């Protein structure tokens, strides 16, 4: 049995706020958000753009990463996390 990849993702809304979620189909989920059929939070903040994502081996791992990311309360804390992890990806 193959395990489907899962993603924790961060969107930037048109009003510059950030939205975090998880999915097993990143491209489809982004399209759903931009069609106004995603989370209530993003429906009134369109369009949204993908700012960052991480890949996981399970939905549960992606959900855990989402929860940990959301513990960062301020935009600056979230952007600092993204900047650090994007640098790590480039160095691998």
Swiss-Prot record:
Residues 4-80 form the GIY-YIG domain. InterPro entries: GIY-YIG_endonuc (IPR000305), GIY-YIG_endonuc_sf (IPR035901), UPF0213_domain (IPR050190). Pfam families: GIY-YIG. CDD domains: GIY-YIG_UPF0213. Belongs to the UPF0213 family. This is UPF0213 protein SPy_1412/M5005_Spy1151. It comes from Streptococcus pyogenes serotype M1.
């Amino acid at each position: 049995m193959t395990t489907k990849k899962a993603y924790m993702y961060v969107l930037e809304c048109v009003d510059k706020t950030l939205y975090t979620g998880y999915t097993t189909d990143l491209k489809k989920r982004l399209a759903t958000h931009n069609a106004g059929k995603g989370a209530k939070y993003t429906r009134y903040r369109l369009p949204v753009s993908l700012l960052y994502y991480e890949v996981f081996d399970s939905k549960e791992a992606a959900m855990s990463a989402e929860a940990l990311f959301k513990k960062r309360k301020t935009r600056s804390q979230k952007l600092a996390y993204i900047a650090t992890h994007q640098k790590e990806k480039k160095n691998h």
